[in-house]
């Protein structure tokens, strides 16, 4: 299959609200020649990254919008526009190859439309984009609801956040403390001809100058390192793990943090890792096996503790709560297409429900770290404020820096917010809570 058609089919599923790129793209990649898979991924992710801008340009060039049933043609047009303005593919090849894919859609009218619109874009597109620059949706390539939400939350930083969201993300590694010191592994990378440097905030983190195939990394198969963003690496040390503790990792997939907990403290009494869907735990199990680690994996709704909790308290809980993922848009640019404003309030409700449900499983004196990869206060500091207001036995702890560094991110009314940095960490939020008393049914705290 032509990589342009494969990318368009994956994007059409996203535009139709039927899938994310993570679920729709692998199916299409299987239909593409191995040598074309990199191009297919670039076309799919690149088009999603710039979709708000490309769709605005398409609207200027089209006489009328596409019908919902023609999402495949719309996606193919966007892929064509992406090639013209954001790739090194020669214009004649971008237009010719994209128009040629129209035959496979079995819509006779599509070929002429695509040819005309793409040629007009080649001639007039740059001028039209300049015309459209006054609209912040076009300028930032973010949907209006998100652009407004970021501006309201971060009036001084919102444009930098958008720019970071549109940049290609760095490849960041986490060194397995059980096998290597970071300085040792940096030397191994140097010997292998891979340029890299130590991360600022994570004492296990290494950022590569250029992404590479994991199979070229020394000791990857042996479990010496994993791929994980620096911001996500901070969770394990924030928990202040000690030997003999029982730890819950709630909403654990794909398991990067689960594994890091076990690397940081090999003498835990056990880790229970819960996720909603059994199929998501497959990846967790694969990561554990590669690293030679063990955890109890449970497929369940973490809120329904009666279904999975054995009644034995946890001394530490990591709640990596489901969220809008607005801090990792650069890694998942289709979030711009799949998320809506209404989702945020619903997610905040879910996050509060998870906190309420898991808090009784935490031992008095135990610690819970709440984490999201969102940059929106509604899902972060506001959720913690509401939880503290209704939970008398909970207190917030300050977040300190690691390895002699100041704490990452920006102090919030509750917790700390990391904003995505070009060439650095993703957007992330952390809050740290301690249980000073149990909660009776009337809501009062009782020590025990």
UniProtKB/Swiss-Prot annotation:
EC id: 2.1.1.176
Disulphide bridges: none
Origin: domain of life: Bacteria
A molecular function (GO) term: RNA binding
Principal location class: cytoplasm
InterPro entries xref list: MeTrfase_RsmB-F_NOP2_cat, MeTrfase_RsmB-F_NOP2_dom, NusB-like_sf, NusB_RsmB_TIM44, RCMT, rRNA_ssu_MeTfrase_B, RsmB-like_ferredoxin, RsmB/NOL1/NOP2-like_CS
Entry keywords, A to Z: Cytoplasm, Methyltransferase, Ribosome biogenesis, RNA-binding, rRNA processing, S-adenosyl-L-methionine, Transferase
EC supergroup of this enzyme: transferase
Gene for this chain: rsmB
Keyword check for RNA-binding: yes
PANTHER family attached to this UniProt entry: NOL1_NOP2_SUN FAMILY PROTEIN _ ANTITERMINATION NUSB DOMAIN-CONTAINING PROTEIN, NOP2 YEAST -RELATED NOL1/NOP2/FMU SUN DOMAIN-CONTAINING
Active site: 373 (nucleophile)
Listed Pfam families: Methyltr_RsmB-F (PF01189), NusB (PF01029), RsmF-B_ferredox (PF22458)
Entry similarity comment: Belongs to the class I-like SAM-binding methyltransferase superfamily. RsmB/NOP family.
GO CC terms in record: cytosol
Full protein name: Ribosomal RNA small subunit methyltransferase B
Transmembrane parts of this sequence: none
Catalytic activity from the UniProt record: cytidine(967) in 16S rRNA + S-adenosyl-L-methionine = 5-methylcytidine(967) in 16S rRNA + S-adenosyl-L-homocysteine + H(+)
Keyword presence, Coiled coil: no
Binding site for S-adenosyl-L-methionine: 251-257, 275, 301, 320
GO process annotations (BP): regulation of DNA-templated transcription; rRNA base methylation
């Amino acid at each position: 299959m032509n990589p342009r058609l494969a990318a368009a089919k994956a994007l059409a599923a996203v535009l139709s609200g039927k899938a994310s790129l993570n679920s729709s793209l692998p199916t299409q990649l299987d239909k593409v020649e191995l040598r074309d898979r990199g191009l297919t991924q670039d076309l799919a992710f690149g088009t999603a990254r710039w979709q708000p801008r490309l769709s605005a340009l398409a609207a200027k060039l089209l006489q009328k919008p596409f019908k919902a049933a023609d999402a495949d043609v719309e996606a193919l047009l966007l892929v064509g526009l992406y090639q013209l303005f954001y790739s090194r593919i020669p214009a004649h090849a971008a237009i010719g190859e994209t128009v040629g894919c129209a035959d496979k859609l079995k819509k006779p009218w599509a070929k002429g439309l695509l040819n005309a619109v793409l040629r007009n874009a080649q001639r007039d597109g740059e001028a039209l984009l300049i015309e459209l620059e006054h609209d912040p949706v076009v300028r930032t390539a973010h949907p209006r609801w998100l652009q407004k939400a970021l501006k309201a939350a971060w009036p001084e930083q919102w444009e930098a956040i958008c720019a970071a969201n549109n940049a290609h993300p760095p490849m960041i590694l986490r060194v397995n403390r059980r096998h290597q010191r970071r300085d040792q592994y940096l030397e191994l990378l140097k010997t292998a001809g891979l340029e890299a440097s130590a991360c600022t905030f994570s004492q296990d983190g290494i950022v590569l100058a250029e992404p590479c195939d994991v199979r070229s990394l020394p000791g990857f198969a042996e479990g010496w390192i994993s791929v994980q963003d620096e911001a996500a690496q901070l969770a394990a040390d924030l928990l202040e793990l000690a030997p003999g503790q029982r730890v819950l990792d709630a909403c654990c997939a794909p398991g990067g943090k689960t594994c890091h907990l076990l690397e940081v403290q090999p003498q835990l009494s056990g880790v229970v890792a819960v996720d909603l869907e059994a199929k998501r735990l497959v990846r967790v199990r694969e990561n554990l096996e590669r690293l030679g680690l063990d955890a109890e994996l449970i497929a369940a709704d973490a809120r329904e503790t009666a279904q999975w909790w054995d009644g034995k308290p946890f001394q530490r809980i990591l709640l990596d709560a489901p969220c809008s993922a607005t801090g990792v848009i650069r890694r998942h640019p289709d979030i711009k297409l799949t998320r809506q404003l209404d989702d945020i309030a619903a997610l905040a409700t879910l996050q509060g429900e998870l906190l309420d449900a898991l808090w009784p499983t935490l031992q008095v004196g135990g610690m819970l770290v709440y984490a999201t990869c969102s940059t929106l206060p509604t899902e972060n500091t506001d959720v913690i404020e509401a939880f503290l207001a209704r939970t008398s036995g909970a207190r917030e702890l300050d977040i300190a820096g690691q390895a002699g560094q100041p704490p990452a991110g920006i102090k919030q009314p509750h917790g700390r917010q990391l904003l995505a940095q070009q060439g650095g960490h993703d957007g992330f939020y952390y809050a740290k809570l301690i249980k000073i008393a149990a909660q009776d049914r009337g809501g009062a705290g009782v020590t025990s």
